[in-house]
C-alpha cells in the first residue's frame, strides 16, 4: 500500500497542484493539519476543498492555525479522524488535532490532556489486546516529545509528553505529525515508525509503503522524506 504523507499546507493549494499527477499512484493520503495560513484562517477552506479534489481517500486532522470548529468542516468532507476511528484496507486510523499551548497567537492551541484525549477516545473503542494496535495509524499534528520530530531551532523539544506516552504504550504502526516545520524527520519509538514530513507550503512531504494484511502483520516497509522541484 503506497501512502502519501502531507502536512502544514498553510493555505497554499498550488503545492497540491504540483503533486497532483504523482498522487494518482498512491492508495491514500495522510494530512497532518494546518490547512490555514498562519495569520489568515480564511485560507483553510480553499485548501481543504483542493485537498478533497486531490485524492478520493484522505485522512486528516486540524492544526493549531485552524479554527477549533474547523474540524467539523473537515468532517463534512469525510476525512477527519480526530477523536474517532476510520478504517481502510485493514488499517485503523485515528488522530489528534491542534497544537500545544505555546504562544497563544494561534486559534487551536490545546492542553496536553486535550491533545491526547482525542486518542484516548479511540482506546475506548478498540479492542484492548497487544496485537490489536499493529494496524493503527495515528495522525497527530503535535509531535511526540523528545523525538527528532519536535525540535525547534534552539534545540528545545516542544512536543507532547502525553502523546509520546500513548505511542510507547500502544505501539501504533505509523505516527504522522507536523507543526514543527524545521523538524522534518523520520524516527521510531519502539516498533512505531514516526514521521514529520515538514511543511508542504515549503515544498516538503513524505512517502511510505505499508505491507501486510490478510492475516499477516502490518509493517512500514519503506519511508522517505521528499522535496518538491
Model-found features: residue ranges?
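Beta-strand-turn-beta hairpins that frame and shape the catalytic cleft
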Residues: 1-4, 85-95, 131-137, 188-193, ...
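Active-site neighborhood of phospho(di)ester-bond hydrolases with catalytic His/Asp-centered motifs
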Residues: 5-7, 29-34, 58-64, 80-82, ...
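Core catalytic region of metal-dependent phosphoesterases/phosphodiesterases
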Residues: 6, 11-88
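Active-site environment of divalent metal-dependent phosphoester hydrolases
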Residues: 10-15, 36-41, 64-71, 101-105, ...
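Conserved catalytic scaffold of divalent metal-dependent phosphoesterases
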Residues: 11, 66-162
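Conserved beta-sheet core of the metallophosphoesterase superfamily
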Residues: 49-53, 59, 146, 151-213
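A short C-terminal boundary segment appended to hydrolase-like catalytic domains
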Residues: 132, 151-152, 214-229
Amino acid at each position: 500500500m503506497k501512502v502519501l504523507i502531507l502536512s502544514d499546507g498553510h493555505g497554499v493549494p498550488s503545492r497540491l497542484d504540483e503533486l497532483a499527477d504523482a498522487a494518482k499512484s498512491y492508495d491514500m493520503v495522510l494530512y497532518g493539519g494546518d490547512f490555514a495560513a498562519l495569520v489568515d484562517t480564511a485560507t483553510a477552506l480553499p485548501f481543504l476543498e483542493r485537498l478533497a479534489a486531490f485524492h478520493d481517500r484522505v485522512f486528516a486532522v486540524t492544526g493549531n492555525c485552524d479554527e477549533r470548529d474547523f474540524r467539523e468542516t473537515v468532517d463534512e468532507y469525510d476525512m477527519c479522524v480526530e477523536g474517532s476511528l476510520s478504517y481502510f484496507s485493514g488499517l485503523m486510523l485515528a488522530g489528534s488535532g491542534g497544537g500545544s499551548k505555546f504562544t497563544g497567537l494561534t486559534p487551536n492551541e490545546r492542553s496536553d490532556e486535550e491533545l491526547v484525549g482525542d486518542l484516548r477516545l479511540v482506546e475506548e473503542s478498540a479492542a484492548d489486546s497487544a496485537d490489536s494496535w499493529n494496524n493503527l495509524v495515528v495522525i497527530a499534528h503535535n509531535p511526540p516529545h523528545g523525538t527528532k520530530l519536535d525540535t525547534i531551532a534552539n534545540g528545545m523539544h516542544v512536543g507532547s509528553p502525553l502523546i509520546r506516552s500513548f505511542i510507547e504504550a500502544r505501539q501504533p504502526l505509523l505516527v504522522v505529525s507536523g507543526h514543527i516545520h524545521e523538524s522534518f524527520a523520520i524516527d521510531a519509538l519502539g516498533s512505531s515508525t514516526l514521521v514529520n514530513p515538514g511543511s508542504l507550503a515549503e515544498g516538503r512531504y513524505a512517502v511510505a509503503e505499508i505491507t501486510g494484511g490478510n492475516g499477516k502483520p502490518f509493517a512500514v516497509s519503506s519511508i522517505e522524506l521528499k522535496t518538491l522541484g
